[in-house]
Amino acid sequence: MISDVQLFKVYGAMARYAAEAQSVSATNIARANEPGYKAKETESFDAFLARVSNSPAADPMTASFHVTESSGPMAPNGNNVSLEQEVFNSAEAMSQHSLALSVYTKSMDLLRTAIGRRG
């Protein structure tokens, strides 16, 4: 069974992941017209959790995320940024961040209620 501390770590890591994914998408969008720029992509959150789970020394709250170059199709100028994909990635990151913060907030509310304090 997942403990409350583990739950906080997972959703804290999910919020950090979403922020990193948003940052990567923003950088890709900002450099969309730069000749030769290769878009970057963040590993999936599932892959991150699997990697961190397999390493007993790794903490999901402090472990870094792997960012790699995208292998998408190249434009004639050597750039491979897809604005449509980046907008989708950005919206997905926003959704993940909102979910993580919502669950985190509700968990804190439950803990406060359990110890007899109101928010």
Show where each model-derived region lies.
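Amphipathic alpha-helical polymerization modules
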Residues: M1-G119
